[in-house]
């Protein structure tokens, strides 16, 4: 799974270059999570998860607080959670998750992004079956052996543990996300380099240079869309 960890690193690195856009997306996601349940992460697991993710992207406290206060204030703005599936150049696969207050606008924007960049929209289920929803938690300062030991002590089962670039990455079932984090916290870990519930491809594909360039443009256009929260794909973008 090392390659998959590299794809997550590449995604985070690319997002560092557009922090204002990332903060806006987190603000929306935090607002929705807080509005759908209690605005307290201790009793709202969805909100707690988003806040843990936000920490790994260094989202400022004032953005988090503003989104939660907006939800507390009874704001009437409502968002729908949508998932689109499609194909890029040479049969590459893409999943797009969105939060939108205008479904027609978002569907049109996503369809146009695919159509103008060598891809096409698929029907629901046409792509997702080739991905596995996975909790991915990364920490520094622990070895693979230490991580295995602390998880065993906490009686937490995981799919895999990888050690790479001084970072230990744990892959687990989505419903084990908080248990894995809590096991690390009990062992003195306070910061996480990765804290995601993501869609990992079962197999990755490589593209020729021309197709790869077109595919990267497709992903860039999708991630630039205001309503798009996450983009997952099965292409190995390593050099």
Swiss-Prot record:
Protein name: Probable transcriptional regulatory protein BPUM_0743
SUPFAM superfamilies, A to Z: YebC-like
An annotated GO cellular component: cytosol
Any single Pfam family the record assigns to this protein: Transcrip_reg
Record flagged with keyword Protein biosynthesis: no
Family: Belongs to the TACO1 family. YeeN subfamily.
Lineage: Bacteria, Bacillati, Bacillota, Bacilli, Bacillales
Keyword Acyltransferase applies: no
Membrane-traversing stretches: none
Gene3D superfamilies: 1.10.10.200, 3.30.70.980
Alphabetized NCBIfam families for the sequence: PRK00110.1, PRK12378.1, YebC/PmpR family DNA-binding transcriptional regulator
Location of this chain's protein in the cell: Cytoplasm
Molecular-function GO terms, alphabetical: DNA binding
GO biological process, one term: regulation of DNA-templated transcription
The entry's keywords: Cytoplasm, DNA-binding, Transcription, Transcription regulation
Native source species: Bacillus pumilus (strain SAFR-032)
